[in-house]
Amino acid sequence: MTISRSTMAQILDYTLLGPEVTNSELAAFIDSAIELGVGTICVPNSMVNLTAKAQEAGIRVATVAGFPHGKTPALVKAAEARLAVQSGASEVDVVLDIAVVKEGDANRLLQEIVAIREAVPSPVVLKFILETAVVSDEAIVTAVNALIAAGADFAKTSTGFHPAGGATVEAVRVMASASRGRVGIKAAGGVKTWEDAVAFVEAGATRIGTSNAGAILEGAPE
């Protein structure tokens, strides 16, 4: 597969989510995002209101809810998502209750996803994190089908914070096969090089979450 640098840049969700991020670090990150030409930045919920410069440059602003453990009630995640949108976010990456994903409980998944979707209707883009490193392929398929049924926009592999690891090509293939184009697929966690990113796109990813956007794009072929 041949992918241009500019196309890859638009696929990237360039991420800065550490708990210690300062305002000055965020400002430098936004300058970097503009210089790199990425499509989206993903920043802490409390800092969305500081991203006007990125928005003015045409960069989409994403944030997170229920992050990184997913162990808050759905209505709390919904409130987080609503606040993020009010602050200027156009996309929210939500961590599902990973135990429910792991159990393959479609009804409980639907209840959670619908509650959040109703709080932030389309055109806000909702991506739901499955933490694929700790769930079975069967559970991944169940979760993807629930996301489709509930009107989600993306299934996302990982938070990037779980000790079990991040995205794998195999998990992305399972997600893409289940989705058949009905929701986008975001690979995140451990994507560090151009070759990594291309492999995930070839497996079916339509977005790449990474804190390594500069290194990835530096690896683009001439």
UniProtKB/Swiss-Prot annotation:
Assigned GO CC terms: cytoplasm
Compartments, record wording: Cytoplasm
Entry annotated with the keyword Cytoplasm: yes
Active-site residue list: D93 (proton donor/acceptor), K156 (schiff-base intermediate with acetaldehyde), K186 (proton donor/acceptor)
An individual GO BP term: deoxyribonucleotide catabolic process
Enzyme Commission number(s) from the entry: 4.1.2.4
Domain of life: Bacteria
Gene Ontology molecular function, alphabetical: deoxyribose-phosphate aldolase activity
Record family assignment: Belongs to the DeoC/FbaB aldolase family. DeoC type 1 subfamily.
Functional description taken from the UniProt entry: Catalyzes a reversible aldol reaction between acetaldehyde and D-glyceraldehyde 3-phosphate to generate 2-deoxy-D-ribose 5-phosphate.
Protein name: Deoxyribose-phosphate aldolase
